[in-house]
């Protein structure tokens, strides 16, 4: 047995538990027939003051597979609007809050499980996710982290040796348990549940807790409540813009899946765009397309409006309306800035009308171009040359005879003319900065569905984890290299 488990000696704080029994239920973790550590996110350990070299695989398994040494384990209570219909029959159905630890940066972080067994909110389910679902979450969260999108992360993924039967993937399939590393698991739906039971006192208690814990810069401000909601609106608008620029479709933007700190979490049937299709819907069960790609900003704003109902028990309507009023402008400004970065430019380099025109022209091109959304930006990164500034014909020359030959020439030429015009308006000294920006904003490969399957199939067929490790390594060493967990294919 390795030395004292560092996860069990962390200075856990009972921040959420201190709210009392109205907010959660104590539960017991499931036991599993086997434990194989498949992924450990060593990048997160220094945030906790831990040296990855001193943390053994068995430490992960003991803490996050056998769940030894922690009590209480809390299933959090919440409600939510699911596909527009209010559901009071929700809560942590296959996970719990393992503990909360303050990082070296002073922030409080949650260890939240997924797949740790039944709770009072399992609604007849077995409380266990598939291994493929765990691998998909690793891919989504690490890629979004690579892009600079606010996201929870996977701290560990452990295969648990059971066979599961699921209707949405070939069965029997393999089981897993995951520990997520998030700023918080408090959701819009956490507040909605309190309104459902007409508990204004608990809304006040929870709001005070959220401000003190996650918006502490507002403590002591007489307008803290109003400023909290306005800042949450900004964070949520920023998050929606980050998703849209990344070509990411969350798939299930119910109010119980939106974080009170504006962080991506609760990954389900997510997908990244292959071809640019604004009406793309990621979830096979979203028959109406409610949560399709193009709807995400509007849904985020709608969910903020729904959050006004419980917050309105302790806040004025005027403060709430003022807080959400800036959503559209904030979203558009962030989206434009991020899209310009994907094209190699900073917003302050260009007049806003010129910048917007380039973005619109790019999206119009991608609507008809036989090329993937993220592939377009990756190719722009790979082929950009400073010579484009002086030679219009040098801009992506191979496209004319290959991918773009099916496009009307005027459409392709229109995009190329605009891009060239912007280059000529910039000093030549800024061209290397464009190359740097393109590299930072555009990974060489994105986890579109064929890529996900190319990673999963070797695992499913041959227990071969090398393709997953190779893909994570590409993101790890590409651009800023933000994604850097470690695949552990043969841990016992």
Swiss-Prot record:
EC primary class: transferase
EC code: 2.7.7.-, 2.7.7.108
Sorted UniProt keywords: ATP-binding, Magnesium, Manganese, Metal-binding, Nucleotide-binding, Nucleotidyltransferase, Transferase
A GO term, aspect molecular function: magnesium ion binding
Essential cofactor(s): Mg(2+); Mn(2+)
Catalytic activity: L-seryl-[protein] + ATP = 3-O-(5'-adenylyl)-L-seryl-[protein] + diphosphate; L-threonyl-[protein] + ATP = 3-O-(5'-adenylyl)-L-threonyl-[protein] + diphosphate; L-tyrosyl-[protein] + ATP = O-(5'-adenylyl)-L-tyrosyl-[protein] + diphosphate; L-histidyl-[protein] + UTP = N(tele)-(5'-uridylyl)-L-histidyl-[protein] + diphosphate
Catalytic residues in the record: 256 (proton acceptor)
One Pfam family linked to the record: SelO
Binding site for Mg(2+): 257, 266
Binding site for ATP: 91, 93-94, 114, 126-127, 180, 187, 266
InterPro entries: SelO (IPR003846)
Top-rank lineage group of the source organism: Bacteria
HAMAP family: YdiU_SelO
Cited function: Nucleotidyltransferase involved in the post-translational modification of proteins. It can catalyze the addition of adenosine monophosphate (AMP) or uridine monophosphate (UMP) to a protein, resulting in modifications known as AMPylation and UMPylation.
Family assignment from sequence similarity: Belongs to the SELO family.
Protein name, entry field: Protein nucleotidyltransferase YdiU
Organism of origin: Synechococcus sp. (strain ATCC 27144 / PCC 6301 / SAUG 1402/1)
